[in-house]
Structure formats: C-alpha cells, structure tokens
Amino acid sequence: MRVKGGTVSRARRKKMVKLAKGYRGQRRINFKVAKQQVWKSYLYAYRDRKNTKRNFRKLWIARINAAARMNGLSYSKLMHGLTLAGVELNRKMLAEIAVTDFDTFAKLADQAKAALASDNVLVQERVAATLETTVKVDR
C-alpha cells in the first residue's frame, strides 16, 4: 500500500508556523511567508549575536574613557599605563569598577600614571643614549 507524506508534511509545516509565533499578519499564518520570515529571523539572530559583542565592547570603552578623563588620563594612556604596571583587568571589569567603585578606579589610574612616568624616564634615557652614539659616529 502506498503511503503519502501528509502526516510528515503537516508536522513539518506546523513546526515552521510554530516558530513564527508572535509575528504579525500572514507571517504568522501562511506557511510559505512564515518560512521565509523564520529563515530571515535566523539570519538576524546570527548577525546580532556578533553585534552584541561589539556593542558591549564599545560601551565598556566609553565608560572607561569617561572615568579615565575624570582622573586626568585618556583611555589609550590609561590602558597603556595599566599594561606597563602589570594590571591584567579586562575592559568589562574595568568598566564595572569605573561605574560602581570610583575610588578603586582612581587608584588604578594612579598606578597607570606612575607606570607611564617611569616609562617616560626610560624612553628619555634611551633617546639620550641614541643621540650620544650618533654624535660620536659623526665626529
């Protein structure tokens, strides 16, 4: 006896229309349109999972920058100073500290300033040494 695929087809269509729950108009009712919209929704979801990560990183950087400027540093100088000081906090944690505990953030900024100051001294010494060697070579 020949078996037609009515039950399987109905189940497949029903599953797709169920995924379209909450959509408006034909996108919720009509299988063909619902299927297209569900596929499009999957694409949006994939894209926006990536965008969420970007958006949070931008938000953290904006918060850190605002707090850093209150302490007399730019974002880039703060991050470079923290790297020189050996502070290994990620942007998410730094942003959380900046929002919730400003005193601790000020201490971190002071550490960054101290590390930048000592690094500037080393750079100036290296520049002076380079200039001395070039003057000796020219003579």
Swiss-Prot record:
<dbReference type="GO" id="GO:0005840">
    <property type="term" value="C:ribosome"/>
</dbReference>
<dbReference type="GO" id="GO:1990904">
    <property type="term" value="C:ribonucleoprotein complex"/>
</dbReference>
<keyword id="KW-0689">Ribosomal protein</keyword>
<dbReference type="InterPro" id="IPR049946">
    <property type="entry name" value="RIBOSOMAL_L20_CS"/>
</dbReference>
<comment type="function">
    <text>Binds directly to 23S ribosomal RNA and is necessary for the in vitro assembly process of the 50S ribosomal subunit. It is not involved in the protein synthesizing functions of that subunit.</text>
</comment>
<dbReference type="GO" id="GO:0000027">
    <property type="term" value="P:ribosomal large subunit assembly"/>
</dbReference>
<comment type="similarity">
    <text>Belongs to the bacterial ribosomal protein bL20 family.</text>
</comment>
<keyword id="KW-0694">RNA-binding</keyword>
<dbReference type="GO" id="GO:0019843">
    <property type="term" value="F:rRNA binding"/>
</dbReference>
<dbReference type="GO" id="GO:0006412">
    <property type="term" value="P:translation"/>
</dbReference>
<keyword id="KW-0687">Ribonucleoprotein</keyword>
<keyword id="KW-0699">rRNA-binding</keyword>
<dbReference type="InterPro" id="IPR005813">
    <property type="entry name" value="Ribosomal_bL20"/>
</dbReference>
<dbReference type="Pfam" id="PF00453">
    <property type="entry name" value="Ribosomal_L20"/>
</dbReference>
<dbReference type="InterPro" id="IPR035566">
    <property type="entry name" value="Ribosomal_protein_bL20_C"/>
</dbReference>
<protein>
    <recommendedName>
        <fullName>Large ribosomal subunit protein bL20</fullName>
    </recommendedName>
</protein>
<dbReference type="GO" id="GO:0003735">
    <property type="term" value="F:structural constituent of ribosome"/>
</dbReference>
